Regions:
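Start-of-helix register in tetratricopeptide repeats
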Residues: 7, 224, 498, 532, ...
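Terminal, low-structured helical/coil segments at or just beyond the last alpha-helical repeat
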Residues: 698-730
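Alpha-solenoid helical-repeat scaffolds
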Residues: 366-561
Length: 730
């Protein structure tokens, strides 16, 4: 079987298991396993089949078994686990993916390369490093770093490729969490390996280990574990229902609600990462080109050197030029995005992932470390001068780990003179701030915040799935819908009003009306709705063009918060969209009472009156709009049309002539032609109709648009029999 056939057959078996068609699933799995030489798996399946056959026989005999449902769940779970391992076993034989090459090479690893043995090597690193520092010229440092990094690499790869931990593996992995000597970076890397392994294949022992890791004292570790849990559940959304002990542990973790709040934060960070492509596009197409266009303006400005140097007074010309260029708004927008945790550096660093360091998958997950051999090679063991400044910058929480490595490698490849010049662009005030102990301490504290750590880790993952050489070998969760609150195991944890509202509002702010609406509806069903929620639900429905439902939501908002101008205005709009012009007019008049000179309100109130054929009243609104807004062409168009259908032809032509002298559209020539024809100016009418046909792009569209006005023309006294003749004049 090829890869596609294996995946399809596996998915078919899983679909049967999800539908609880266990007997069929076992039969299909038996056929699936005939293609594999894995006898232990065949034995496991045979045992599961035998147990199920006995269970069915007892049921047929009417034997009451209070443990029947529990046993059924266990057999179904075992069948699913066998299917998982069978899939991997078959793929190992045909797939060229890195993961399967690792699995095929696992047998070559010496047996002493277990977790506990590797742990001892890693634990010895801090002491060995301290000894190296005492030696002249850090003698032996290169060999020590190489041994440490290779050991961490073996632990990462062997953990990732091990799809089914034994009890011994689980106990040894717990030993890593309990160790006080293991370097935190190594534990972080191991946590990522556990997550990657779970993405490939569900393993209860690994998931249980992540639940332990969430309570680890180190923030780097517990935040990685939290993200790992989110990823595991996104990859296997229904799987936890088969393991009551795991769902019970999740509930226990959330006893005080803190786990749910943290997981909800991860949820938002994952959703926010899905906005990265939009931000990247904005950076490439708007902000960077705008900055390039304004380089000369900013460079040629007077920088006020004649001012008293003692005065900290900025030249107002700078701000004016900055704001008038439009760059100010764009940079403020990007600053706001950065402050909320958006990934604003992806476009900058995407091109800097071609260094040899990034060819190895595990390096994408290694926390940034100035003592990593690749960094020491470029900057030395104890950075000084410019490198010390760079080191301070890298301690901040502004860049994710992957980007910090990219920045270092890029700086290392820049000649020293240019590097010095770049860093010299920082003012002495900036440098003093960095060197100032209290301020650098504040930067470190910011970098150590749980939300900053988890957000930067999500950015690391985003880069791995989008930029790594082997990205096509992985399922990219960032391309899929992320809806953690819908996962059954998280229902009691995340489906709480105070958490759902944050997700709903995120989708609302990012203009995802369908996703926001689903959550607002859920909040309404939980009886947690206020006027604000009904307003937002209405707005989402309006964006989805579900106007009648939007009206229902807005009316409820109006009951809870009466006469709110925003609600009234949107009610008017929705009624107008469903062509209930009488109701729309009623609400426009309410808005008018609050905002008597709102241009849009005047125009749409007049439009509703025109649709209701109350032309005299409509004209009063359009005249008022024309009075308060100079050269208002849309008011002229409305006056022209209302005057025409109301028999005021001279007034109609007066306004159409004003339009034709300004910025006419095809419809303006058409309507002016109607007026000219009705006033007996046949030649002028034909001329105007010809211009309309030209503007419409041909006779076909012109005749279609003309046909829509035919009834109105006849009502105004144009003979229906003359219409074909006029068409031939055009």
């Amino acid at each position: 079987m090829n890869e596609q056939a294996i995946q399809e057959q596996y998915q078919h078996i899983v679909a049967l298991l999800k539908q609880q068609r266990l007997k069929e699933a076992q039969s299909q799995l038996e056929a699936f396993l005939w293609n594999s030489g894995d006898w232990p798996l065949r034995n496991r399946l045979e045992q599961a089949q035998t147990s199920y056959q006995y269970m069915l026989q007892y049921m047929r005999q009417g034997i009451d078994d209070p443990e029947r449902q529990k046993l059924y769940r266990q057999i179904l779970t075992e069948t699913w686990e066998v299917a998982d391992q069978a899939r991997l076993s078959l793929l190992d034989g045909v797939s060229t993916h890195y993961y399967h090459s690792l699995r095929n090479n696992r047998e070559r690893l010496p047996k002493e390369y277990n977790i506990a043995a590797l742990q001892k090597v890693l634990e010895s690193f801090p002491d060995d490093l301290a000894v190296c520092q005492l030696m002249p010229d850090n003698q032996g440092l290169d060999a020590l770093l190489q041994r440490h990094e290779q050991t961490a690499q073996v632990l990462f790869l062997s953990t990732w490729s091990n799809s089914d931990w034994s009890t011994e593996d689980e106990q040894q992995a717990k030993g890593l969490l309990e160790s006080e000597m293991l370097p935190v970076n190594d534990l972080c890397l191991f946590t990522s390996a556990v997550m990657l392994s779970l993405m490939e294949c569900f393993d209860t022992r690994k998931f249980s280990w992540l639940l332990d890791a969430v309570t680890h004292a180190n923030t780097q570790v517990n935040q990685r574990a939290l993200v790992g849990i989110a990823f595991a559940l996104l990859f296997h959304p229904t799987r936890l229902s088969l393991y009551p002990e795991l769902t019970a542990r999740l509930s226990l973790l959330n006893e005080d609600g803190s786990f749910g709040k943290q997981l909800n934060r991860i949820y938002i960070e994952l959703l926010r990462s899905q906005e990265t492509e939009k931000i990247d596009k904005k950076m490439r197409e708007e902000i960077i080109p705008e900055m390039m266009r304004n380089v000369n303006i900013m460079r040629n400005m007077k920088f006020g050197f004649e001012e008293n140097p003692e005065e900290n007074d900025l030249n107002p010309d700078w701000e004016k030029a900055f704001e008038s260029s439009g760059l100010g708004d764009k940079i403020r927008e990007m600053n706001e995005l950065q402050l909320e945790g958006a990934d604003v550096y992806m476009s900058t660093f995407a091109q800097l992932k071609t260094y040899p360091f990034f060819k190895e998958p595990y390096n994408w997950f290694y926390p940034f470390d100035m003592h990593h051999s690749s960094i020491i090679k470029e900057f030395g063991f104890k950075p000084t001068g410019d490198n010390a400044i760079l080191s301070l910058i890298l301690q901040s929480g502004f860049f994710c780990n992957s980007d910090k490595y990219s920045l270092c490698f890029t700086m290392a490849h820049i000649p020293q003179s240019q590097r010095t010049m770049m860093l010299s662009q920082m003012t002495s005030q900036d440098l003093d701030a960095l060197m100032d102990e209290s301020k650098s301490s504040a930067l470190r504290q910011y970098a150590e915040r749980p939300d900053v750590i988890s957000n930067q880790y999500v950015h690391d993952l985003y880069r791995f799935f989008k930029l790594s050489q082997r990205r096509h070998e992985f399922r990219d969760i960032f391309k899929e819908e992320i809806a953690l609150h819908r996962i059954p195991a998280l229902k009691d944890i995340l489906c709480k009003p105070e958490l759902l509202i944050t997700i709903a509002d995120f989708h609302f702010r990012k203009e995802h009306p369908a996703e926001a609406l689903e959550l607002y509806k859920e909040l309404i069903a939980l009886n947690h709705a206020n006027a604000d929620i009904f307003q937002k639900a209405g707005y989402c429905l309006q964006k989805e063009k579900r106007y009648k439902e939007a009206i229902d939501a807005y009316l409820k908002a109006d009951v809870l918060k009466p006469d709110h101008v925003w609600t009234i205005r949107h009610l008017a709009t929705c009624y107008r969209q469903i062509r209930d012009f009488a109701s729309a007019l009623e609400y426009y008049k309410k808005v008018e009472a609050i905002q008597p000179e709102s241009h849009n309100v005047l125009f749409y109130a007049g439009s509703c009156l025109a649709e209701l054929e109350r032309y005299e009243e409509a004209l009063q609104y359009f005249f008022k709009l024309d009075f308060i807004e100079s050269n208002c062409i849309k008011a002229w168009r409305a006056i022209g049309w209302c005057s025409f259908v109301n028999g005021k032809y001279e007034q109609a032509m007066k306004y159409y002539e004003k339009i034709l002298a300004s910025k006419p559209l095809a419809a303006d020539y058409l309507n002016a032609g109607h007026v000219a024809w009705r006033t007996g100016k046949i030649e002028k009418a034909a001329e105007l109709y010809s211009k309309a046909a030209l503007e419409y792009g041909g006779q076909e569209i012109f005749r279609e648009m003309f046909g829509k006005d035919k009834e109105t023309l006849v009502r105004q006294g144009i003979s229906e029999k003359d219409i074909p003749l006029m068409m031939d004049l055009v």
